[in-house]
Amino acid sequence: MATFKDACYHYKKLNKLNSLVLKLGANDEWRPAPVTKYKGWCLDCCQYTNLTYCRGCALYHVCQWCSQYNRCFLDEEPHLLRMRTFKDVVTKEDIEGLLTMYETLFPINEKLVNKFINFVKQRKCRNEYLLEWYNHLLMPITLQALTINLEDSAYYIFGYYDCMECENQTPFQFVNLLEKYDKLLLDDRNFHRMSHLPAILQQEYALRYFSKSRFLSKGKKRLSRHDFSDNLMEDRHSPTSLMQVVRNCISTHMNDCEWNKRCHVIVDAKNYISIMNSSYTEHYSVSQRCKLFTKYKFGIISKLVKPNYIFSNHESYALNVHNCKWCQINNHYKVWEDFRLRKIYNNIMDFIRALVKSNGNVGHCSSQESVYKYIPDIFLICKKEKWNEAVKMLFNYLEPVDINGTEYALLDYEVNWEVRGLVMQNMDGKVPRILNMNDTKKILSAIIFDWFDTRYMRETPMTTSTTNQLRTLNKKNELIDEYDLELSDVE
């Protein structure tokens, strides 16, 4: 029983403005839709159901019925979902605008209540006040919202969400923004609405209001790779594939600094209808490059590492070793389809082997060494503390020599041409015979930064950018990168 969905269905019949604003895919005829994957709340109709991916941001936040309208909370078009979406910092004035919008779209007065009651009583055996028949009148005005952190911004999607106790498999979390407003003013507003209802409905209205306005906010979730769908990718088998984003726009662009003022546009119904008549869609192809995806890929590699290679005498690259049960790696995993990751793995292992061999370690493939447990962490460049600790333990394992208070390790074993070039690039044009700890860190990080320079990466994919940001980046030709040409970050 989705209260918000029911309210939209009944209230859209009131006038022309409501019929335009409150049109939901969940209340229309069902059309073929993508397969659902996660359990959560549809941001468009607020019902708890199975969710599918959004074509605007790749997050799972829309039900299979609402997906037909392709609405995203990051759109520019002021549809109902966009007008309910606020961005930090939310002020009391912003909330006043939201409450005014609610009162405009979902009014409760004596005349309207009688109209709905008479409509219900026209049906056979409906003289009682059963809650399912009057569900649309039982939606209180609250400051309940689902929130998500994207880059440096927190977004709040206000609405009336039932079943808060149910399992949430999405990155959105419930928050109560009542502290940003006056509790007594909100109470008064709802008591006034409630006073027009029959006594039996007043009790249910009050119960719903207090349960949805006095709850404790939950801690914000951290995004993971699995929160984003692969369905927006042009070629799901290509690791450098672009992601196709569709955004709903209007002819009169509004600046992002006025994000929270979008709900004010319905004050003038004629102007709002004119704005919506100018709506159109913009399509963008964006890179999937970001820390979130990179961290996920390196996490997989760290679990596949065969550290025995650093003591081996194989002439081939680490990924090309065959017929050696200690060094041969399973390269059938999808992650190895990315040529950048193959290069990084081969070069990191080649450089570490050169360090180990240069410092008198004459082990072989089957050796069981204490340093092995730290090798996988050297690929976790996004986890700085763990990465630094791994490099430190590797360097100490080399038994460096103290010279004037600084410890040095030898580097006189042959490395491949790619590694040699990177070493020269980062060590003033030459390959040094001795390295200190900082030199070792610089070279190891340079091998990774050559293709994945995480220092300058976004935290989340560009699909989570606002429409204005996408438009600006597109003009600068910064939505895509040159990996398909095998050009690295440095090049």
Swiss-Prot record:
Region of interest: Zinc-binding domain: 42-79
InterPro entries per the UniProt record, alphabetical: Rotavirus_NSP1 (IPR002148)
GO biological process, any: symbiont-mediated suppression of host cytoplasmic pattern recognition receptor signaling pathway via inhibition of IRF3 activity
Entry's Gene Ontology molecular function annotations: metal ion binding; RNA binding
Signal sequence, renumbered to the chain: none
Any one cellular-component term (Gene Ontology): host cell cytoplasm
Pfam families membership: Rota_NS53
Residue span of motif pLxIS motif: 485-488
Region (Important for cytoskeleton localization): 82-176
Highest taxon listed in the record's lineage: Viruses
Cellular location(s): Host cytoplasm, Host cytoskeleton
Predominant localisation class: host cell
Keywords recorded for this protein, A-Z: Host cytoplasm, Host cytoskeleton, Host-virus interaction, Inhibition of host innate immune response by virus, Inhibition of host IRF3 by virus, Inhibition of host IRF7 by virus, Inhibition of host RLR pathway by virus, Interferon antiviral system evasion, Metal-binding, RNA-binding, Viral immunoevasion
Region named Interaction with host IRF3: 320-491
Region ranges (RNA-binding): 1-81
Family, similarity comment: Belongs to the rotavirus NSP1 family.
Function: Plays a role in the inhibition of host innate immunity by inducing the degradation of key host factors required to activate interferon production such as IRF3, IRF5 or IRF7. Associates with components of cullin RING ligases (CRLs) including CUL1 or CUL3, which are essential multisubunit ubiquitination complexes, to modulate their activities.
Subunit structure: Interacts (via C-terminus) with host IRF3; this interaction leads to IRF3 degradation. Interacts with host IRF7; this interaction leads to IRF7 degradation. Interacts with host CUL1 and CUL3.
Domain remarks: The integrity of the zinc-binding domain in NSP1 is important for degradation of host IRF3. The pLxIS motif targets host IRF3 for degradation; however phosphorylation of NSP1 pLxIS motif is not required for its activity.
Name of this chain's protein: Non-structural protein 1
Organism: Rotavirus A (isolate RVA/Cow/Thailand/A44/1988/G10P8[11])
